[in-house]
């Protein structure tokens, strides 16, 4: 039975991914900084779902989560780096701490996940990494400067590792949707997104 670990899986896109792969018969790891919500989803899904605590910006947290998951699932076949945050508004009106936090979660979180998961992925019967990027990785976006920059970085990490990890037979892929109607974007202040409209949902 194949397995998948999803970061930021307690709600939104991560929860939708967890539900989809559970329906496909996978062992599903629902890891999130909000453990109670992750556990609630795991309980709803059933015995092939497992919840755990994960702060993606903390490398040690990744090491603990991966060890916990692989002890439960047996191996790691698919890693989904989904966790991400977004601050919207004029660049100069956004506190520098918010810009730094965006990069720590959205970029360092992916670096930490890929780096710490590699030993487990190399041992698996087959292995894939899926990084959640964004259409903002293709063009810079006003009012979303640090978010857009972080997704450019994720795109670069993905393309580079997909080439580099061919030697391990590990594919590294990304998904670059337009903005999806989730809690993360509900209160965002970005005129460009409002003009385009948000037409995707997790349903």
Describe the role of every protein-language-model region.
Residues 90-91, 95-100:
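Substrate-binding pocket helix/loop in short-chain dehydrogenase/reductase
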Residues 174-175, 190, 194-203:
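C-terminal helical subdomain
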Residues 134:
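Residue(s) in the substrate-gating loop at a strand-loop-helix junction
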Residues 114, 150:
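Active-site helix of classical SDR
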């Amino acid at each position: 039975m194949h397995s998948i670990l999803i970061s930021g899986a307690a709600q939104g896109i991560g929860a939708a991914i967890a539900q989809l792969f559970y329906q496909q018969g996978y062992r599903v790891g629902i890891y999130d900084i909000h453990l109670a919500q992750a556990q609630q989803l795991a309980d709803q899904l059933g015995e092939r779902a497992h919840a755990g605590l994960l702060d993606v910006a903390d490398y040690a947290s990744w090491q603990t989560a991966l060890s916990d998951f692989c002890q439960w699932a047996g191996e790691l076949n698919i890693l989904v780096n989904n966790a991400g945050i977004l601050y919207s508004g004029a660049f100069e009106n956004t506190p520098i701490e918010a810009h730094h936090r965006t990069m720590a979660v959205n970029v360092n979180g992916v670096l930490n996940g890929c780096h710490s998961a590699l030993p487990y992925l190399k041992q698996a019967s087959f292995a894939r990494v899926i990084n959640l990027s964004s259409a903002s990785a293709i063009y810079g976006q006003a009012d979303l400067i640090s978010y857009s920059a972080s997704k450019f970085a994720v795109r670069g990490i993905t393309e580079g590792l997909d080439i580099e990890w061919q030697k391990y037979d590990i594919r590294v892929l990304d998904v670059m949707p337009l903005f999806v109607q989730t809690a993360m974007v509900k209160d965002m202040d970005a005129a460009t997104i409002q003009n385009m409209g948000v037409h995707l949902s997790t349903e």
